[in-house]
């Protein structure tokens, strides 16, 4: 599973990149989506690598995102009771672990919005003009979890 965060804005974006960001549902800066690791998504990430930060998300970070930034239709917060009622998993943490392992999908929660609207990174970011490790763009690997924690 990859977490993808849009780091740059909307001005002067090439049409192909803009359309790919739209397909990924990354319409605004600091929006995040969680996508599976498939060849088609990897190709999309290759197109938008100069506008996003992405990497492999772990279960703890996904649980944190779901608990703090997970929203249902009507802008209701995601709760343990809702997860238990709809999926059978007891807590958000168990559900996040199952999603990362591939046993469940985020689509198993029927009203969950696919985009997490994150806070700008606390303590700032390195640079949005350079790639990782000098800046914040491109592939981060496991370090994306640190960035997502700063943006919780």
UniProtKB/Swiss-Prot annotation:
Coiled-coil annotated spans: none
Pfam families per record: Ribosomal_L30 (PF00327)
GO molecular function: RNA binding; structural constituent of ribosome
Keyword Ribosomal protein: yes
UniProt GO cellular component terms: cytosolic large ribosomal subunit
Gene3D superfamilies hit by this protein: 1.10.15.30, Ribosomal protein L30, ferredoxin-like fold domain
Disulphide-bonded residues: none
GO BP annotations listed: maturation of LSU-rRNA from tricistronic rRNA transcript (SSU-rRNA, 5.8S rRNA, LSU-rRNA); translation
Keywords: Ribonucleoprotein, Ribosomal protein
SUPFAM superfamilies recorded: Ribosomal protein L30p/L7e (SSF55129)
Highest taxon above the source species: Archaea
Family note: Belongs to the universal ribosomal protein uL30 family.
UniProt subunit comment: Part of the 50S ribosomal subunit.
NCBIfam families in the record: PRK06049.1, uL30_arch
Protein name, entry field: Large ribosomal subunit protein uL30
Gene that specifies this protein: rpl30
